[in-house]
From Swiss-Prot:
Main location: secreted
Signal peptide (UniProt feature, chain positions): 1-17
A UniProt-annotated Pfam family: Glyco_hydro_7
InterPro entries referenced in this protein's UniProt entry, alphabetically: ConA-like_dom_sf, Glyco_hydro_7, Glyco_hydro_7_sf
Active-site positions on this chain: E227, E232
Protein name: Probable 1,4-beta-D-glucan cellobiohydrolase A
Main enzyme class: hydrolase
Amino acid sequence: MHQRALLFSALLTAVRAQQAGTLTEEVHPSLTWQKCTSEGSCTEQSGSVVIDSNWRWTHSVNDSTNCYTGNTWDATLCPDDETCATNCALDGADYESTYGVTTDGDSLTLKFVTGSNVGSRLYLMDTSDEGYQTFNLLDAEFTFDVDVSNLPCGLNGALYFTAMDADGGASKYPANKAGAKYGTGYCDSQCPRDLKFIDGQANVDGWEPSSNNDNTGIGNHGSCCPEMDIWEANKISTALTPHPCDSSEQTMCEGNDCGGTYSDDRYGGTCDPDGCDFNPYRMGNDSFYGPGKTIDTGSKMTVVTQFITDGSGSLSEIKRYYVQNGNVIANADSNISGVTGNSITTDFCTAQKKAFGDDDIFAEHNGLAGISDAMSSMVLILSLWDDYYASMEWLDSDYPENATATDPGVARGTCDSESGVPATVEGAHPDSSVTFSNIKFGPINSTFSASA
């Protein structure tokens, strides 16, 4: 994943804060999902979703004065990190009319552009509606249905997990009065520095407004944690990517020591910003995923991901299956010379990095073992976004831009390099959307029929 948080273009006044406002009631849209014990034996869970606090209107605790407008902090309310956290509150959300988020039973639809808002990021809440639902992915299987038929080049309808705190960080950082109810506590392997509040304090100090996005900027601090990208996709390309970190929990970083695409040294932090990705097109299989292909993105599909452990209980393999039109379809096999298989293993990742000439940052952060410890408690995230850093070329086009398209690993999909420029995709495809539904979780082979 490339600079996920910075790349979101949010509502004009979107901001992360640590106080809870009272001007708009916060009501989480309901979303059901299923917990399974064996094939055909699943129990419905009554959950809900909450939008990330970076999208919310944030204002003075005393009135409706904005704490943050465009990509600039109010100098009076926010002269420094601690004062800003005390002075500012984030408020409730109107999910459909402001953010284009709707639910229906077990289905969640995210619309791309709604008024001045672009994209969204949401978390699954637990049945109490007080904290995030957490999942232990080890020796488990996660399955969902997805419709990407309305996601053109340059967009990313993502479903992934990170090692966020279940309460949004409220217990660790008492200054955070908003907590999970208001979508606080985000972290990922990019150690995002565009978050307006981290660990109960604002990110005002050192804040630099973005040069190409009127709504975002970068502060001195970032928020790091392991990340498991189960699904990053549009109708052209898809990628499955684990990202390890040196710590299994959320940590705050500072400046260029954060690494990732927010910093001068991409690989200077404690996490792997690139991960070990399995994109069928990048692995040399250009007939597997897309409109009219083996996995036909013109129709809804079921996506199955299995997390296999070794004898010691540590993650050793990530396997992928699809179910479409009643057929179970194994993941595409690699067609890259020197790289074999259709699942993510240590051997696959080592061979892939060598074949593509990539720095093996994955191994430097302990590879699959580096994410395994975090997988006992991860939070589910569902989002739709466009990319102000690399126009989503890393997912669906040729990347890096100056590389030769025929070199191994450069071609990620068939999209034109200009198709994902945010101004282009926002102007041409504002009504794009993604729908996630029928989420199931349980032991291996419990969430789908292998003989479908």
